[in-house]
């Protein structure tokens, strides 16, 4: 196609969002996905940073995500509230301390090694998650779970019967139930925001999750903390209850259907309908069943400004009732996969903290690379 206008970029460039709130939120990317000599085109709402002679491309990227650079860029924003942009000309003449080229490469090598490990863990987790999803689909959608002889049930001629409520054939002996049968469905609420003592940060309070936290957590399956915690006073103010580790969180509005599994005791705001695995199923089966039902859940959401699924409607959505022995076998198989995914996510959080701790000290020369 033909491109008219926009911003051009190539491999090795750094793309820096220049409009609020993307700049403040750290929206920056290093380009390494194009073919050789291929040119990319994009919006005019980002700045292309291209390394000059004696500037390492990767060092320039890490400089652009450093707190010092970010603070300077934010201070140069102009315009009306909500539509502010960085003054590019002012940014161009800003001064930053730059080490010699060899030091730049050493700094970039250290930080890149951390990011490469994070990327590898993410890739492994994507493949593991695809395996778990495929297993669920194979057993509970295609009905090729292992029969008594260890062969795929439906493909090997296992008896199927038509179920009028589900309007499809299911394995003999299986039935229908409702989403509320997966586990106890719970909601949440928000403490009075004008009372500052209701909230705290830095892990000093109780984890309080919002749909925005799940959005920021996208790509991860598990969640431990949100951006803000609530205090004991906050819990009482909003009559919040703490939900156990293993609770499956599902955002019920703005948007509907973000999922995560709690790795510690926590609570949520009112944007959730979460499932406590206190009945016959564990967190793994609940998670994949909800994931499989998301289209139906979204279709049952209502609202003009934004869609929301109510607890009353959600709990009555009909789902397949499987054989519990098959479910238990599935849960055992998937549990080991999910443990691996969780370990990788924890390692990535630790690596991210290490990178963010090292970054400013390496950039400003507080720490030297030998």
Where are these regions (language model features)?
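DNA target-recognition domains and sequence-specific DNA-contacting regions of bacterial/archaeal
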Residues: 1-98, 147-162, 168-322
């Amino acid at each position: 196609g033909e491109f008219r206008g926009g911003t051009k970029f190539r491999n090795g460039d750094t793309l820096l969002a220049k409009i609020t709130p993307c700049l403040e939120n750290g929206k920056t990317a290093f380009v390494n996905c194009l073919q050789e000599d291929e040119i990319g085109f994009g919006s005019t709402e980002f700045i292309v940073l291209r390394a000059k002679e004696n500037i390492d491309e990767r060092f320039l990227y890490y400089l652009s995500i450093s707190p010092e650079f970010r603070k300077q860029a934010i201070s140069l924003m102009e315009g009306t509230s909500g539509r502010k942009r960085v003054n590019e000309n002012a940014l161009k003449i800003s001064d930053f301390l730059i080490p010699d080229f060899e030091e730049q490469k050493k700094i970039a090598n250290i930080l890149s090694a951390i990011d490469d490990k994070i990327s590898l863990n993410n890739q492994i987790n994507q493949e593991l998650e695809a395996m778990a999803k495929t297993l669920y689909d194979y057993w509970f959608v295609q009905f090729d779970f292992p029969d008594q002889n260890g062969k795929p049930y439906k493909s090997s001629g296992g008896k199927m019967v038509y179920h009028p409520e589900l309007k499809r054939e299911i394995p003999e002996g299986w039935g229908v139930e409702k989403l509320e049968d997966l586990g106890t469905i719970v909601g949440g609420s928000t403490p009075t925001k004008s009372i500052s003592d209701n909230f705290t940060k830095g892990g000093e309070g109780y984890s309080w999750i919002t749909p925005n936290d799940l959005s920021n957590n996208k790509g991860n399956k598990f969640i431990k903390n949100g951006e803000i915690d609530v205090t004991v006073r906050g819990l009482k103010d909003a009559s919040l209850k703490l939900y156990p580790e293993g609770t499956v969180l599902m955002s019920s509005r703005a948007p509907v259907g973000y999922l995560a599994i709690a790795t510690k005791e926590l609570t949520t705001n009112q944007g959730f309908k979460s499932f406590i695995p206190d009945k016959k199923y564990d967190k793994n089966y609940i998670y994949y069943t909800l994931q499989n039902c998301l289209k139906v859940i979204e279709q049952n959401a209502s609202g003009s400004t934004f869609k929301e699924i109510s607890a009353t409607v959600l709990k009555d959505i009909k789902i397949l009732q499987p054989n519990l022995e098959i479910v238990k076998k599935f849960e055992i198989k998937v549990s080991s996969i999910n443990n691996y995914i969780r370990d990788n996510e924890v390692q990535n959080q630790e690596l991210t903290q290490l990178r963010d701790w090292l970054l400013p000290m390496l950039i400003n020369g507080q720490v030297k690379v030998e």
